[in-house]
Each structure stands twice: as structure tokens, then as C-alpha cells.
Amino acid sequence: MEITDVRLRRVETDGRMKAISSITIDGEFVIHDIRVIDGNEGLFVAMPSKRTPDGEFRDIAHPINSGTRAKIQEAVLAAYEVADEPAVNEESSADESIVEEN
């Protein structure tokens, strides 16, 4: 199984949720509403879930082994970190690379 695409949208809230993501598996299957949560021990990925009538949350889709969970978490958190980097201003980068020779 390969994660072939990760789409991530940051959310600005006062809560612990930092982003919502969708992943594509093997270019054939998409899972939406994967959340990036800021937990007590750092960022982690929460799979999509729904609330049952008794108030409990149940995963809609989830990996069945730790290796697959690790792949999903690594891919989503890598996309989150890239989204956190400031954009590079191409004009200032070009100006800095010009060296005057006298």
C-alpha cells in the first residue's frame, strides 16, 4: 500500500485540531476528514469518525495494523510540516543571488 496523494487544509480554531486532510491510497481509494490534532505528546492523526446515538465516537475508516497507521501518520504530518513553512519570495531570492563584479 502506498499513499499517493495527501491534501491538507489548515484550520484556524482555538481548539486542538490543526488541519483536515484527505489521502489517496494507490491512486485508487480516498479517505477524507483525517484530522491533525495537537495532543499532550505532540501532533497526531485522528481517523474520520462519527458520533453514535449514545455519544461515543466510532471510526468510519481506520488502519488495521500499526505499520499502515504509521504510514498514514507520517504522510499526513509531513504534509502538515510543509504547509507550515513560510512561502519563499522568489524576487528576494533572485536579488540575493545577484553578485556584482567590479
From Swiss-Prot:
It comes from the Bacteria. One of its GO terms (biological process) is sporulation resulting in formation of a cellular spore. InterPro entries: SpoVG, SpoVG_sf. It holds the Pfam family SpoVG. Keywords: Cell cycle, Cell division, Septation. The keyword Nucleus does not apply. Could be involved in septation. Belongs to the SpoVG family. HAMAP family: SpoVG. This is Putative septation protein SpoVG 1. It comes from Listeria monocytogenes serovar 1/2a (strain ATCC BAA-679 / EGD-e).
